[in-house]
Amino acid sequence: MKFAVIQFPGSNCDLDMLHAIRDSLGEEAEYVWHAETSLAGFDAVLLPGGFSYGDYLRTGAIAKFSSIMPEVLRFAEMGKPVLGVCNGFQILTEIGLLPGALIRNNNLHFICKTVPLRVANADTMFTGLYEEGEIIQVPVAHGEGNYYCDDETLLKLKDNNQIVFTYDSVNPNGSRADIAGIVNERGNVLGMMPHPERAVEDIIGGTDGLRLFESVVKAWKEEQVNA
């Protein structure tokens, strides 16, 4: 399976993402510069964390207009897996692949620590190797990770089982309904603020994030068999 790691000016988690896929997961991964216009040959797209375009205007607002974005939209429309982490999640909301928005943390401080997450939906291509209700430990590092949506959108997310991860015990940023990660209605686009790529090795704190990537590979292989 081959993963595309999209790089923007200001990305700083792209190397972490590449390392997670190549070295921990054992799959192919390549960088794709934001000015490219093709994702041919790739099976999954990863939008990493960082500060694309310096977070000017607002997080993800300028990345929305990058040349690669029409191809990311087409990729998602084809049903292929798209994962946006931290700034990548913010970008996914800006381009309309996911509802809602990410705003300033309610304490107005940058947060960098490992937090407990509850797996709210284990029936997605990203969470198939987790158990529903399982508590996992994944790092966060953000200043604008406070997920916001209106009441109608929140109800829809709940009704469609689109809330995939929630913060457990303590909500670090004020996100509505403790939301840490959501999928689109089709289930092939996941946005999350915590960093699974930073939880893929025991030596740096655990491997709870690795199963997310393993789940994607498992779902992809099953699709190839059934194709």
UniProtKB/Swiss-Prot annotation:
The EC number(s) this enzyme carries: 6.3.5.3, 3.5.1.2
Record NCBIfam families: FGAM_synth_I, PRK03619.1
Superkingdom of source: Bacteria
Subcellular localization, as worded in the UniProt entry: Cytoplasm
Name of protein: Phosphoribosylformylglycinamidine synthase subunit PurQ
Domain Glutamine amidotransferase type-1 per the UniProt entry, residue ranges: 2-226
GO BP of this protein: 'de novo' IMP biosynthetic process
Biochemical pathway: Purine metabolism; IMP biosynthesis via de novo pathway; 5-amino-1-(5-phospho-D-ribosyl)imidazole from N(2)-formyl-N(1)-(5-phospho-D-ribosyl)glycinamide: step 1/2
Function field: Part of the phosphoribosylformylglycinamidine synthase complex involved in the purines biosynthetic pathway. Catalyzes the ATP-dependent conversion of formylglycinamide ribonucleotide (FGAR) and glutamine to yield formylglycinamidine ribonucleotide (FGAM) and glutamate. The FGAM synthase complex is composed of three subunits. PurQ produces an ammonia molecule by converting glutamine to glutamate. PurL transfers the ammonia molecule to FGAR to form FGAM in an ATP-dependent manner.
Catalytic activity: N(2)-formyl-N(1)-(5-phospho-beta-D-ribosyl)glycinamide + L-glutamine + ATP + H2O = 2-formamido-N(1)-(5-O-phospho-beta-D-ribosyl)acetamidine + L-glutamate + ADP + phosphate + H(+); L-glutamine + H2O = L-glutamate + NH4(+)
Entry annotated with the keyword Ligase: yes
Organism placement in taxonomy: Bacteria, Bacillati, Bacillota, Bacilli, Bacillales
Gene3D superfamilies, A to Z: 3.40.50.880
Keyword Plastid carried by entry: no
Complexes and interactors: Part of the FGAM synthase complex composed of 1 PurL, 1 PurQ and 2 PurS subunits.
Residues forming the catalytic site: C86, H195, E197
InterPro entries per the UniProt record, alphabetical: Class_I_gatase-like (IPR029062), PRibForGlyAmidine_synth_PurQ (IPR010075)
Listed HAMAP family: PurQ
Keywords attached to this entry: ATP-binding, Cytoplasm, Glutamine amidotransferase, Hydrolase, Ligase, Nucleotide-binding, Purine biosynthesis
One GO MF term: phosphoribosylformylglycinamidine synthase activity
Cellular component aspect of the GO annotation: cytoplasm
